[in-house]
Every structure is written in structure tokens, then in C-alpha cells.
Amino acid sequence: ENHNEASACVEALHTRFAQFGLKLHKDKTRLIEFGKYAIERRERHSESRPETFNFLGFTHKCAQTKEHGWFTIHRHSIAKRVRATLQKIKEQLRKRMHRPIGETGRWLRSVVQGWLNYHAVPSNSHCLCRFVDEVTRLWLAVIRRRSQRGRSKWTWDRMQRLARLHLPRPRITHPYPNQRFRARLKAGAV
């Protein structure tokens, strides 16, 4: 919100880190215009949308709610990391190509469920659905490569039935931060 407060916070971080012999990385630490009024201020000055930043596996963006136009922060999984995860899954699927489908399905379920457990935050549902769809497509490609005869049997409809059987459904499991903090206040944790 306030540039002076943000600068003071950065100085305090430098001081605190120095006590433990640590330093903030200059290329990864910067002040950006972000927050409740950033969109309005940038529109007033005819500037583009507020900058985004990556933190803890998510790209954070200033946004407004569709219904009321209130400020909110959208968190989307970092695209580069999603691609890297899908590439690792693809490599593992190729190694497990001739394993029984049920065994591969159980393995995929645990991998996808672990990914969803972390990334299932509000405003990220599109990324979750896309991730599960991509895993399904990768699995279909590997199944079709198993034999020449089996290629025509494995249609997208059949693969979707198999995916529904083995892969978890993408859904938001983490609450909005304000709901989480409200629960902590009621419990007396803060």
C-alpha cells in the first residue's frame, strides 16, 4: 500500500537476515506496486495492469471479483513448473508403459493427488482441471503406444472413463485466506 512502509520493511528484513549471516538475493527481491489500490492507481496514470510475482509455486496477480469488483489476489500455478511436472510424469509413464493399467492408475492417483493437495487454492481451478486433463492425455498416449492393435480401441471417451476411475477430481480444498484467519481468531490461536 505505502512505498515508505514497504521500504522500511525491506530494510528490516536486511537487518534481520544479517543477524543470521543471510542476505536477500538482489535479483529476486524488489518492490512492486501491488495491493488493493494498485489497479486504480495504474489506470489513473494510463499504465498497464499491476505486475505479478512468483512465490511458493504460484503466480500472484491483483484482481477484482466479478460480482462486486472488490480487490482480491488470484493465485495460479506457475506455468513453467506445471510443464516441468508434466514432463516428469511423461517420462515415468514411458518407463511404466508395460505395467498393468491398474498399477499405473494407482501410481498416477497418488502423484496427481499430491499435486492437487498443494495447488488446490481459490482462483486456481482452471489450472487444476487443465493439469488433470494433460495427465489423462499423456496416459492415453502411452497406452496407445503399447501395441499397434490397441490403438483404435482407446478412444478419448474410453480414456475419460478410465481417468474417472483412477484419477482424483480437481476441486478447491483450501479456503480463502480471510476465512482461514477468521477461524484462527475464533479459536484464539492469534
Predicted region positions:
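Non-catalytic terminal/accessory segments
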Residues: 1-190
